[in-house]
């Protein structure tokens, strides 16, 4: 069966078409700048030259139609017609308390819409993508895979905030986490490499990018995770502040006269390594500036590293030990310096990496030093494949 996986953002659509016979990627692509000037489709079929098409793309329906036209194009296409697509899997950032992927029906769409308040940049566009597929490919089964689903295995004491219980119940306030599909994929892959069931392993996965989260995995379930009610919590990130004293929020609102929306912008868009460095939200820029002696870049870097080390140590305590540590996502897969800095002076936990093995970017590799108790890996994430697998399983059930 061929499965199309879609990831609809506020102004973009990413797609991959899988042949599930061998889980190969037949084509992948990206539509950018939906609804704004300069919109473009970049289509990359396996074994063929890429197609770049600049055209007006006013909405997600037009964007998805362009993706499908590229997939069936006489020269750049990889399928003859739409009927070859057996099912469609959608990445949904916020799934509330959905514990697993589900087939799309009216109740699923209603839930995604109601949860838009918790992920305004993501759930709305994803819902528009689902509705576009219903219009263009009527009758084709659709599946929603939720970034939050893997974290629904957390015990209640891990996801509960110590605010008035009634307020939390009324407003659905709890730890939801994010990047769940990525954390689950790399944990399963690491378990496969070491040749043991994930249920028997204590694992910490580090999804490090512009948005970062760390997850403790026990009995093959998420036991705790750094992101919380929203993806603002946890580590210092590219533009997000991560964990701060909550009293800072009303303090700044009073001192600076910020509205709630303005305060949200400060924490989500103007903070993190961008806010500390005053330079950039891109960790590559931070590394380069630090090498040139920029002290605020150094400070931003060290604040980030400190926050990551703190979560790894805390989660090793919660797990009562550690078997596997995994680095993934843009920074985790590609920054030699970030992995080295985070793992430095962690030998008391059994974590020690080999400097030569660590010279890797974007490739799967074990980087454990000889004699280290904890096995450390770099594993490129593959959320799309996880979504495709879930989609296939639900459609065939």
Curated annotation (Swiss-Prot):
Q: Which positions does UniProt annotate for Mg(2+) binding?
A: 7, 383
Q: At which residues is there a site annotated Transition state stabilizer?
A: 179, 240
* Note on how the cofactor is bound: Mg(2+). Can also accept Mn(2+).
Q: In which pathway does it act?
A: Metabolic intermediate biosynthesis; acetyl-CoA biosynthesis; acetyl-CoA from acetate: step 1/2
Q: Which residues bind substrate?
A: 91
UniProt: ATP binding residues: 14, 207-211, 282-284, 330-334
Q: Where in the cell is it found?
A: Cytoplasm
| List of catalytic residues | 147
Q: What does this protein do?
A: Catalyzes the formation of acetyl phosphate from acetate and ATP. Can also catalyze the reverse reaction.
Which family is it part of?
Answer: Belongs to the acetokinase family.
**What is the protein name for this chain?**
Acetate kinase
